[in-house]
Swiss-Prot record:
GO terms for biological process: prolyl-tRNA aminoacylation. NCBIfam families: PRK09194.1, proS_fam_II. Keywords: Aminoacyl-tRNA synthetase, ATP-binding, Cytoplasm, Ligase, Nucleotide-binding, Protein biosynthesis. Catalyzes the attachment of proline to tRNA(Pro) in a two-step reaction: proline is first activated by ATP to form Pro-AMP and then transferred to the acceptor end of tRNA(Pro). As ProRS can inadvertently accommodate and process non-cognate amino acids such as alanine and cysteine, to avoid such errors it has two additional distinct editing activities against alanine. One activity is designated as 'pretransfer' editing and involves the tRNA(Pro)-independent hydrolysis of activated Ala-AMP. Homodimer. GO terms for molecular function: aminoacyl-tRNA deacylase activity; ATP binding; catalytic activity, acting on a protein; proline-tRNA ligase activity; transferase activity. Consists of three domains: the N-terminal catalytic domain, the editing domain and the C-terminal anticodon-binding domain. Belongs to the class-II aminoacyl-tRNA synthetase family. ProS type 1 subfamily. It holds the Pfam family tRNA-synt_2b. GO terms for cellular component: cytosol. This is Proline--tRNA ligase. It catalyses: tRNA(Pro) + L-proline + ATP = L-prolyl-tRNA(Pro) + AMP + diphosphate. Its main location: cytoplasm.
Amino acid sequence: MKQSKMLIPTLREMPSDAQVISHALMMRAGYVRQVSAGIYAYLPLANRTIEKLKTIMRQEFDKIGAVEMLAPALLTADLWRESGRYETYGDDLYKLKNRESSDFILGPTHEETFTTLVRDAVKSYKQLPLNLYQIQAKYRDEKRPRNGLLRTREFIMKDGYSFHQNYEDLDVTYEDYRKAYEAIFTRSGLEFKGIIGDGGAMGGKDSQEFMAITPERTDLNRWLVLDKSIPSLSDIPEDVLEEIKKELASWLISGEDTIAYSSESSYAANLEMASNAFSPTTKVAVAEDLKEVATPDCKTIDQVADFLNISAETTIKTLLFIADEKPVVALLVGNDQVNDVKLKNYLGADFLDPATEEEAFQVFGAHFGSLGPVNLPDSVRIIADRNVQNLANAVSGANKDGFHLTGVNPERDFKAEFVDIREVKEGEASPDGHGHLQFARGIEVGHIFKLGTRYSDSLGANILDENGKSIPIVMGCYGIGVSRILSAVIEQHARLFVSKTPKGEYRYSWGINFPKELAPFDIHLITVNTKDEEAQTLTDKLEKELMTKGYEVLTDDRNERVGSKFSDSDLIGLPIRITVGKKASEGIVEIKIKASGDSIEVNAENVIETLEILTKDH
């Protein structure tokens, strides 16, 4: 493919509005362009990469018997009302009316559509299991689109749905998908973790998220690709290294999720779902009597602890939430933070919001800063983190402005449901007893769910079992963020290319090292001087030979400065660069492996053989 015939609008500088490196490089390298807020056009390079990713997915899904189809993106609202999600999905749902004023939505996901299609076609257990998927654009009205393709209003997604007679059959397909996802992400060149995830608005019970790990900016060996003029990092002057470190640190670490994982085992979970090792303690302290003490102007845990000269770990934090329009009190040890997702999941609530001060006063008879669990009406549900159960003679609000209670003891002074509702902290013991918890940032690229009968119950998707009894279909759901993977791959494979000029000046610039299976082309073939007839003839000959051998070649035939061509080549990020330059008359060309920065001069007649050797282990 001639580069002059493609739309690759590279930029001289990083776009000023980009905060994460993947967004900046996709724009600068000419992969995407923003059409409006949260909506992007995928230009030829990005489209080629996405098509390669789709091919990988189709190959892996064929292995597990998944069948591709295509459902409409424009969906009737009636189905979503029937499932109950029209009201509960929230403001992210695109809602519209046709000319007859009938309600429609733009599909953010397709559980209802696939369930009803199968409901109307499948009547017997003999027709199951069934495993269907599609790859299409989805729509969510994000309040604040950001970070390029990571948070958009239109995005490309693969969503699959499996249908089963029982949970045992679902378990088999769920495991098949887990292995297929691992194969897809591995082939895509991603560093990832499969972690315990939250089902969220999808419903269901078990789920696993696949998170692409966002690399820290401190490992120079990972981020820098040195030109052959620089033997090693130690050869770069300290002042230049400091500049490079500042450049790396200037970009936000992308990934809206925090992953908690064990330092010694395979345990990994989204921070929203992560737990730590817990064991109840035996209380040895003598229970003190409740005592009301004045705590003037103390509105926070830290202020109360300082005023009473105690540790925050001996206080009870009292929060009020409104869960599906009902008040719920949440209790935590004073220095802990509530995990809203854990609390919402435990309650089985569709909506969970922090209460207003007015709502708190109606329940407690006091304002924020003085709330506590003692002497609340029996009608008020109290959910306490399990660590609260270990407290003895604690301090809590007295439900009287400006006062607190000392000598508060769980069970004696208040009754609660003790469960895990806190956010874990880095360094705590892993829940499996092996190692301690470490944190990393991650980009969610896939998610699989055991939906159970959540949608078949609400939509009446039933079959007759072997005894002729009507039973609900058991379902699984499996999603991959196709366009998100493009961002995640670039985030992990962005590099700073460092070189040294003949005058001894050090230069560095951003580019991409695309993994082979997702690179838009295999080889970037560059002619230094397109007006040199010998060089052009050699380029044409090489291009034909390479393509005959099955290589996908992008030939830079533009009449541009060689520096501009090399800069664009680094940005675009193809795995191999072949340069036809000054030695074209001798039949000599340069082959450069982008990932390592290594280069070698070879006779043009030996290019194919040399490539086979150089790429054997890549």
